[in-house]
From Swiss-Prot:
Chief localization: cytoplasm
Transmembrane intervals: none
GO biological process, one term: microtubule organizing center organization
Presence of the UniProt keyword Cell inner membrane in the record: no
Cellular component GO terms held in the UniProt record: centrosome; ciliary basal body; cilium; cytosol; HAUS complex; intercellular bridge; microtubule cytoskeleton; microtubule organizing center
Function: Contributes to mitotic spindle assembly, maintenance of centrosome integrity and completion of cytokinesis as part of the HAUS augmin-like complex.
Oligomer status and interactors: Component of the HAUS augmin-like complex. The complex interacts with the gamma-tubulin ring complex and this interaction is required for spindle assembly. Interacts with EML3 (phosphorylated at 'Thr-881').
Protein name according to UniProt: HAUS augmin-like complex subunit 3
Modified residues (N-acetylserine): 2
Gene name per UniProt: HAUS3
Keyword Cell division: yes
A Pfam match: HAUS-augmin3
Length: 603
């Protein structure tokens, strides 16, 4: 036991509270000093729990200190102890039987002492004889030790070389096994390196939550059959005023409800406009009457008016009112109905425009929400594909590593078998018990012959006797070949580094093309995206052209509805394109009718 451990044990004996937390090796440096070593050894050997004051004694001492009485210390305490009278020790008298027992024990101890002295003398004689023998054997031992040291030096060099290679191999294997340990060992001892070691529960739960939220969002934002309505929203469905025209929509009930709703809206709008006109007219009449009353009051207050002039004014005003009423009745009966008939469709235009605006706003809203959902789905698909690609890459790497490890295991097993065979050959007594070394190699020394064959290679010339000199020559040639191979390896390493630098440059160029100077990976080619943008711009232009064509078609239909001559021209063109014979018959009938009318007019 070390001195520090003894010191800690004595502290435990005397009841030091924190002795269990102390380490004995941390106190070994205390015993290195010459001055403190004797005291510490005395402390470790003599001090025990009896030298420690109890709690009662400490309390009594503290009470004594508080009382103010003098306490003896040092020399005064020594003098007081000298003056104290020692108590007389009364030794009890022993019996005769006890004395006889003690005498017998003394005799037996003396006999044992004599026997041990005789054994000591015999051992001294034996030691002298063995010392003479040891002197004789020292010369032989020195010669054997020299040979042993030489052989041990060779073996130690080989062992150190093999141990270094094995240590390097074990370090590399441990580093490799750190990556392939099971992930249940914990993150403290096994840092997660591969993607397959990470759990996908959190990622999958998040994806499930996002898909659930996306489905709820689509259910809330889109009603059932939205794509059918959007696909069927052509120009004929938006002509809500023309109730007589058949609709393309298959559901006649929805179409009828929509027509009734539009008719109600148009009627409500016309009624509101009618009430607005009446209110404006009444408001203007009230303003004019108030103005006239103010003027009349002003004229009455400014100067007195005669009754005759007032009657004349009233009669003139009544005549003017009669004329205005006649004009109003004429306007109501004659001009107003024609104007109302001509502008009846204009009254319905705000309602139709509002309906169109509402449908366009709904369509824009749904397209925006569809784009959001589409972007989210594209992100999820991209993340899944990226994860799948990374797993496939890692699986390929693991398969390659597994193949390499299998090949390594096979090579190691083969080398292990060869090593066991060589050890069996070395245990052969003809090889191990050879005392006088000779230049020629024994034919039974299979390991040396095999070594010579390995070093020499394929040599057709066979020698009868193999010597150690030949073995050294072959080893020297092998050394030269190894130096040449090392030079070639250095050149190939330089070429490999140049090849790697070139590949790194290619990788950097590829990264530049993929990232385009940014931090995000471009999943598509820049040229393709530009072409897609061009196509989108062309589609937008095409949409504008289609809207212009639809507007032109609407205006032409309005003109056809208002002009009968254009309607007839259109019918002629339709007949001309569909049925030429029918058109000829109609033209001939019209010519005959015109001739008959001309003849009747001449008559």
């Amino acid at each position: 036991m070390s001195c520090g451990n003894e010191f800690v044990e004595t502290l435990k004996k005397i009841g030091y509270p924190k002795a269990d937390n102390l380490n004995g090796e941390d106190f070994d440096w205390l015993f290195e000093g010459v001055e403190d070593e004797s005291f510490l050894k005395w402390f470790c050997g003599n001090v025990n729990e009896q030298n420690v004051l109890s709690e009662r004694e400490l309390e009594a001492f503290s009470i004594l200190q508080k009382s103010g009485k003098p306490i003896l210390e040092g020399a005064a305490l020594d003098e007081a102890l000298k003056t104290c009278k020692t108590s007389d020790l009364k030794t009890p008298r022993l019996d005769d039987k006890e004395l006889e027992k003690l005498e017998d024990e003394v005799q037996t101890l003396l006999k044992l002492k004599n026997l041990k002295i005789q054994r000591r003398n015999k051992c001294q004689l034996m030691a002298s004889v063995t010392s003479h023998k040891s002197l004789r054997l020292n010369a032989k031992e020195e010669e054997a030790t020299k040979k042993l040291k030489q052989s041990q030096g060779i073996l130690n060099a080989m062992i150190t070389k093999i141990s270094n290679e094995l240590q390097a191999l074990t370090d590399e294997v441990t580093q490799l096994m750190m990556f392939f340990r099971h992930s249940n060992l914990g993150q403290g001892t096994n840092p997660l390196v591969f993607l397959s070691q990470f759990s996908l529960e959190k990622y999958l739960s998040q994806e499930e939550q996002s898909t659930a939220a996306l489905t709820l969002y689509t259910k809330k934002q889109f009603f059932q059959g939205i794509h059918e309505v959007v696909e069927s929203s052509n120009e004929d469905n938006f002509q809500l005023l023309d109730i007589q025209t058949p609709s393309i929509c298959d559901n006649q009930e929805i179409l009828e409800e929509r027509r009734l709703e539009m008719a109600r809206l148009q009627l409500a709008y016309i009624c509101a406009q009618h009430q607005l006109i009446h209110l404006k007219a009444s408001n203007s009449s009230m303003k004019s009457s108030i103005k006239w009353a103010e003027e009349s009051l002003h004229s009455l207050t400014s100067k007195a008016v005669d009754k005759e002039n007032l009657d004349a004014k009233i009669s003139s005003l009544t005549s003017e009112i009669m004329k205005l009423e006649k004009e109003v009745t004429q306007i109501k009966d004659r001009s107003l109905p024609a104007v109302v008939r001509e502008n009846a469709q204009l009254l319905n235009m705000p309602v139709v425009k509002g309906d169109f605006d509402l449908q366009i706003a709904k369509q824009d809203y749904y397209t925006a929400r569809q784009e959001l959902v589409l972007n989210q789905l594209i992100k999820q698909k991209a993340s899944f594909e990226l994860l799948q690609l990374s797993y496939e890459i890692e699986l390929r790497k693991h398969r390659d590593i597994y193949r390499q490890l299998e090949n390594l295991v096979q090579e190691l097993s083969q080398s292990n078998m060869m090593l066991y065979k060589q050890l069996e050959m070395l245990t052969d007594p003809s090889v191990s018990q050879q005392i006088n070394p000779r230049n020629t190699i024994d034919t039974k020394d299979y390991s040396t012959h095999r070594l010579y064959q390995v070093l020499e290679g394929e040599n057709k010339k066979k020698e009868l006797f193999l010597t150690h000199g030949n073995l050294e020559e072959v080893a020297e040639k092998l050394k030269q070949n190894i130096s040449l191979v090392q030079d070639q390896l250095a050149v190939s390493a330089q070429e490999h580094s140049f090849f790697l630098s070139k590949r790194n440059k290619d990788v950097d160029m590829l990264c530049d093309t993929l990232y385009q100077g940014g931090n995000q990976l471009l999943l598509s080619d820049q040229e393709l995206t530009e072409q897609f943008h061009k196509v989108e711009s062309q589609l937008n232009k095409l949409n504008h052209l289609l809207t212009d064509i639809l507007a032109d078609v609407k205006t032409k239909r309005k003109t056809l509805a208002n002009n009968k001559l254009h309607q007839m021209e259109r019918e002629f063109y339709v007949y001309f394109l569909k049925d030429e014979d029918y058109l000829k018959d109609i033209v001939e009938n019209l010519e005959t009718q015109s001739k008959i009318k001309a003849v009747s007019l001449e008559d």
